[in-house]
């Protein structure tokens, strides 16, 4: 698998270098939107040696190859659903640590009164358990 990845990366790195030596750079226009691939041939003044069909075929093959390549390397990446141990911290709380100073309640203090209930009972309104 490492050989295939290295070979594909080498091809993708060498391809622009080889293509730039054989052709002149095209003129750029501000109105070119590369998200609309059907407008790519009309963005440049210089006509290409390849027809539009070849251009679309090359783009389609590159999209297909990159999709296959991405699906091939996805199981080896620790992202998304594959990231089982992405967070290397325990899911359970840490064990209790003994504090340096224990809080001790005074011995002779009376208990604080219980808080008043937030609801009024029916029996409190009627006068008891009659």
UniProtKB/Swiss-Prot annotation:
GO BP, one annotated term: regulation of signal transduction
TM region(s), chain numbering: 53-77
Cell compartments where the protein resides: Host membrane
Keyword terms: Early protein, Glycoprotein, Host membrane, Membrane, Phosphoprotein, Signal, Transmembrane, Transmembrane helix
Domain of life the protein comes from: Viruses
Membrane topology: Single-pass membrane protein
Source organism (scientific name): Human adenovirus C serotype 6 (HAdV-6)
Pfam family membership, one: Adeno_E3_14_5
Protein name, entry field: Early E3B 14.5 kDa protein
């Amino acid at each position: 698998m490492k050989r295939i990845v290295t070979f594909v990366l080498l091809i993708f790195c060498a391809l622009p270098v080889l293509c730039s030596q054989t052709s002149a750079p095209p003129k750029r226009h501000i109105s070119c939107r590369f998200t609309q691939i059907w407008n790519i041939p009309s963005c440049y003044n210089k006509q290409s040696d390849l027809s539009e069909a070849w251009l679309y075929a090359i783009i389609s093959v590159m999209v297909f190859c990159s999709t296959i390549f991405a699906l091939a390397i996805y199981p080896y990446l620790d992202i998304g659903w594959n990231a089982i141990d992405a967070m290397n911290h325990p899911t359970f709380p840490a064990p209790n640590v003994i504090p340096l100073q224990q809080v001790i309640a005074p011995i002779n203090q009376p208990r604080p009164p219980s808080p008043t209930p937030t609801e009024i009972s029916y029996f409190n309104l009627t006068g008891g358990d009659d």
